[in-house]
Amino acid sequence: MHELSIAESIIELLEEHAVTHKFKKVTKIILEIGVLAGIEKSALFFCFDVAAQNSLAEGAELLIEDKLAQGVCQNCHLQVTTTGWYEPCPYCGQLLINITEGEQMKIKSLEVEN
């Protein structure tokens, strides 16, 4: 379950930002996760609650926004949006899409208290 290590990394990032930006508590976190990131959202919610115990993020609301994948078709060279690895190009039908975006995860926004 790599979601636990992801949740722990999020807490570490929050603690680093708390020192830099001088806040004491996180009340809300919005993550943006690519649909191809391989992260199980329900597991991440559970693991985040566990990792946040006794931290500045304990009790924080965690929201996750999906980010669609983007790619470029190697056949027709058009940029396409996709939700899976092996979907055909909507323009030419070929299965030759190079994924350029959609595997990442980022903290999109935070709500904090001083």
Curated annotation (Swiss-Prot):
Keywords: Metal-binding, Nickel, Zinc. Ni(2+) binds at residue 2. GO terms for molecular function: nickel cation binding; zinc ion binding. InterPro entries: Hydgase_Ni_incorp_HypA/HybF_CS (IPR020538), HypA/HybF (IPR000688). GO terms for biological process: protein maturation; protein modification process. Zn(2+) binds at residues 73, 76, 89, 92. It holds the Pfam family HypA. Involved in the maturation of [NiFe] hydrogenases. Required for nickel insertion into the metal center of the hydrogenase. Belongs to the HypA/HybF family. NCBIfam families: hypA (TIGR00100). This is Hydrogenase maturation factor HypA. It comes from Psychromonas ingrahamii (strain DSM 17664 / CCUG 51855 / 37).
